[in-house]
């Protein structure tokens, strides 16, 4: 999935999980959403390997920075970095939760695309994938943007952000139904034409 959509999803999740009455030691809304935005974009920092070699990028992209095993380490490092950037105004603990959520939703967003994500790196290069969504999905992005706009208009409650996330989950669920139907059709086609298909796959397409 594109990095901007990842980042926006992190901001929406940060808003949806904001405490109703933040304590003085907790992040204010604007800061919290920016941290969610940045943290959700972080896993794609592996793009720097593109400057080493295109093949290296293809083989390592969605690797160690997208690993659920490494997520605690990346969360801690980001929390420390954010603490330094605000010059200790907030403890690193204030950043941990939203940073973890941001990285987590990025990983989830990549798992639902076809390229696959090495969620167990560096111990395994197996790529998890549940390919329901095209890598750039305007509808997916629009739902997130709609949730953020609604949250800014009705800023007294986190309900619009929660609803936005619920609609997003429902949309992916609908795509999953379509994906399963496509697999069923592919299997039926292979059987009817006496094709020895070892595996049938359905790859999502734009629109």
Feature annotation, model-predicted:
Residues 1-184, 188-189, 193-204:
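N-terminal membrane-targeting hydrophobic helices
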């Amino acid at each position: 999935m594109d990095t901007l959509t990842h980042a926006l999803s992190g901001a929406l999740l940060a808003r949806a999980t904001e405490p109703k009455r933040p304590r003085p030691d907790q992040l204010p809304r604007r800061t919290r959403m920016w941290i969610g935005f940045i943290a959700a974009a972080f896993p794609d920092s592996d793009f720097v390997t593109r400057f080493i070699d295109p093949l290296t990028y293809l083989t390592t992209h969605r690797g160690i920075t997208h690993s659920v095993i490494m997520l605690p380490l990346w969360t801690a490092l980001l929390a420390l970095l954010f603490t330094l950037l605000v010059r200790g105004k907030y403890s690193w603990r204030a950043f941990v939760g939203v940073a973890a959520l941001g990285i987590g939703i990025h990983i989830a967003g990549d798992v639902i695309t076809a390229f696959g994500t090495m969620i167990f790196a560096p111990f395994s290069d197996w790529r998890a994938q549940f390919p329901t969504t095209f890598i750039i999905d305007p509808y997916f992005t629009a739902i997130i943007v709609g949730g953020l706009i609604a949250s800014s208009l009705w800023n007294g409650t986190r309900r619009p952000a929660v609803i936005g996330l619920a609609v997003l989950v429902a949309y992916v669920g609908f795509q999953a139904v379509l994906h399963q139907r496509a697999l069923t059709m592919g299997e039926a086609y292979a059987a009817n034409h006496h094709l020895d298909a070892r595996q049938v796959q359905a790859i999502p397409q734009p629109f």
